[in-house]
Amino acid sequence: MGEDGGGGEFPPKKDGVEEGFPTKKPARQLDFTGGSDEHSLSKPAAPTVVATSVKPIISSSVPSTIRPGMTIAIGQVTQVRPTLPMATTMSNPPSQSQIVNAPIRHPIPESPKARGPRPNVEGRDGTPQKKKQCNCKHSRCLKLYCECFASGTYCDGCNCVNCFNNVDNEPARREAVEATLERNPFAFRPKIASSPHGGRDKREDIGEVVLLGKHNKGCHCKKSGCLKKYCECFQANILCSENCKCLDCKNFEGSEERQALFHGEHSNHMAYLQQAANAAITGAVGSSGFAPSPAPKRRKGQEILFNQAIKDSSRLSHFPQVNNGRTGGPTSGTSPSPVSRAGGNASSVPSKFVYRSLLADIIQPHDVRALCSVLVTVAGEAAKTSTDKRNEIENRVDDQTETSLASSAQDQPQGNNNAADVEMVATDHNQADKSGPEESNSDGVDASKVTPLSPATLALMCDEQDTIFMVAAPSPNGSVDPNGCRPNSQGQSEIYAEQERLVLTKFRDCLNRLISYAEIKESKCLSLARMHIQPPAIATVKTENGIQQQVPIVNGASRTNCQPTLNKPQPMQLMNTTSAAPATATNTQHLQKPPALSEKKDP
């Protein structure tokens, strides 16, 4: 690009352009070197920054070598940041000497109305974040500590008072911008060199992390290791630089903690999505007794959790693997061991497990309903039995009384006998009339001892009366108590006590059967877990008959059996006593068929 390269070589001169062009306008042609107009127009030159008051002429015949969005200032190439509110004018000056002599002015931010709406700033996980709103009270939103003014945007929906950062007060806003730039030319420079307001082309990709940009002021983290979202560098997905004043920083290139954090988040997120899809398809979390819960987004000390999961693998072996149906005897190939499942999960990604009860598939809703019906039936039978006993006792007492009266009447003289009989009969009738309506439901208790009740209380108690649990013996004269809603007699207390005893006894028997089922199932799972963890060694033992048998060795000691048939695996029910086996079979029928429950009397 020498000065002596003729004007007609490249690009070719055009007479039309030369004739229609003014000959002497140095301010418009920016010819500060004294060259001819033809040379200045025909030479390709380096780009430069021109003041906004100067309007240069761009020749259509000169090819442009600069891209839009680039500006050159004093031989130093810098990239224009999209968030800077600057108005730049591109031109093709004639020579390099103009770069030295061109005046340099601080660009004035353009009005926000000239730019299109900015997209919402996305976080590290791609979630759009809401635009921050300012709360200025006394600055009229024309100071740098107003986030809207510092970012070059108008206040929109903010909580500010007496705001001038809007379209109506554009002249005042312009003056504030110019005054701020005179004091600090870099006032409107964003904190991050590659501002996130532009396209998120530098977003992190698993496998190849692209990290560009630098924090102009730096972060000041002290305890987070710069691996939390409140670290501005970490939130912007850039590495900490020399501008940062953080302590114990782990946000640098090659940091194992940062890589483990990113890759762990990605793998856990993908695993959880796959698990959720499988659960949606099958309609259940899983057939086993464990349902892995979704892993948290942020994990602290993954190595500690991994080691802890390995150490707890033996504890997980005690947890059963629950099948969909009721399990029978243990077999070696019927169901996989829960230890293999726990070990597989621990080796890939440590996750939490939700323990299911041993009785998860044993107790069914119809079993609970059957138990309730059985208890109600037992209570009703107990009430009837107690009532019958009371009636029988009362009849015996009446018979004895009549017998004694008859014998005493025979011993007295005949004259006095008639008068005594009349007096006795009258007395009995009077007592029956008095005690009948008042004490028919009290079983001989004095009516004066009964606590009087209000009509509202009596109505409520009558509504809640249960015919099964409140069976009262009829009075001898057949009368009915008009206030018979509150049992206060000794007989009713005995009935309730008997009902409670029988109900609790039946419920205790049911709980004992459930405990037996759980113990049997636990023994099955433990045997399967032991077989999976440590298969029994086979040793050759010579018996008394001279026949060599192979028996398992448990804990370093071989166990020999006299009968070869005992070496075969037996069902778990046979491990209990012979009396427990039929009881278990009958117990299963009791849960399914309530009427067939066998009543066990306490010793």
Curated annotation (Swiss-Prot):
Compartments, as annotated in UniProt: Nucleus
Keyword field contains Metal-binding: yes
Residue ranges with Polar residues bias: 402-417
GO cellular component: nucleus
PROSITE patterns (alphabetical): CRC (PS51634)
Pfam families found in the cross-reference section: TCR (PF03638)
Region feature (Disordered): 1-47, 105-133, 316-347, 386-417, 429-450, 584-603
Biased segments, Basic and acidic residues type: 386-399
GO molecular function, one term: metal ion binding
UniProt keyword Nucleus present: yes
InterPro entries registered for this protein in UniProt: CRC, Lin-54_fam, Tesmin/TSO1-like_CXC
Expression (tissue specificity): Ubiquitous but expressed mostly in flowers.
Positions of the CRC domain: 130-254
Family listed: Belongs to the lin-54 family.
Domain remark text: The cysteine-rich domain CRC binds zinc in vitro.
Summary of the function given for this chain in its UniProt record: Plays a role in development of both male and female reproductive tissues.
Name recorded for this polypeptide: Protein tesmin/TSO1-like CXC 5
